[in-house]
Amino acid sequence: MKTIIAYHAVTERPLLPGQVILMDAEHQNGVGRRVAEKLPLVERIYRNPAAYRADGLEHHTAVTLRELAMEEVRRAKYPQYPSRMACLYVSRTLEEAEKWADFFARIGRPTYAVVKLEITGRCFIGDAERCFPGSPDRVENIRLAEKYWAYPQNGSGNAAVCEMLADGEIRVLETVKEINANL
């Protein structure tokens, strides 16, 4: 495992310097927890997709449909990458993390700070614009998930909105910027 430095826009709960976060199959993130809560509904949707309209799905239900497709494709074709349901979403640069923090604060999400991290684990840099609203059409969800994971890993940073997924041992090195919005 290689060690890298990255940054994170802290939402949901504060992170403190020296704190260690473990992200792996046994330690899911908020996405993973929300997906688990929606599994019974997803099973009903996939048993009878004609009874549901994509534009009528509640936000977290659409996200769950997307994330389950993302995980299915990752496990089958890209197991070397972190799971979106057991990772920390981080940024390669302070500037990227500040943009995410500003975005989260603007949409009303509790946003505490931007922190600098030391990550010993796996990373995947993807194009956040390739995230899609999940739909009752499982085949289409899988097709779109394949496009997300196939994003070229050339490090050129050519994606308009990068998202970096990191798992493993993640240590908070310092708080770089206090935000404290929508708390």
Could you describe each region identified by the protein language model?
Residues 2-5, 11-62, 84-86, 95-113, ...:
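Conserved NAD+-utilizing ADP-ribose enzyme module
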Residues 79-81:
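A short acidic-Thr-Gly-centered motif at the start of a beta-strand
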Residues 59-77:
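Active-site-proximal specificity loops/subdomain of glycosyltransferases
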